[in-house]
Amino acid sequence: MAIVGGPGVGKSTLVRQLADLYHNGSYGEGEKGVWDPRVLQDIEAGRNPVGVTAYFAAVYDANYRSASAHDAPGKVIFCEGARITLEAHIAEYPPEHHDALRRVAAQGDAWRPDRVIVLTSSTDTIEKHILRRARAHEDVAKMVLRFRLIDAEFRRLAPGSPNTIVINRDGLEFHDRAGLDYIIAAAGLPPFAEIPYQEMAGT
């Protein structure tokens, strides 16, 4: 499939959103239009913790299965989510749900990423990014508190999680090469092939 059109018409966004819909719903440019809207509503309201966690476990599992089917020597495949993700989010729910949530998180035992990058940040950076994404169901102050809680769990769990590195993303932008190069170096990722750009004389 190819998406074409003039500059600024929305090609990149459409490619990302459609690719997301056709690839288990985890990489879209904002989740609106991709996820069932009840997922975000329930996250914001703190409802249905086991259902929310099971949904993400199913999304992650589908992507790990897809990655396994498409893996090959020299190939680098990125997935969002790992067992540590499901475990870190347990902290945001009342203790009476924790046993059921741990049972859901155990699904992540089958996932074996070569590297897990835990992104962490200051609350100022997080507030800026939450404001920028402007989700209809998000209260910014509540989301910042939620981030602090979950971020602390990621930091606590990371030392015991295999092949896991914690990277503070403050000051890093992922829309420019410097930020990406920093992540690649810090995580010890393999080199990537770059298509060269050349100035060429007209004929």
Residue locations for each model-derived region?
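Conserved substrate/cofactor phosphate-moiety recognition/catalytic segment
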Residues: 20-65
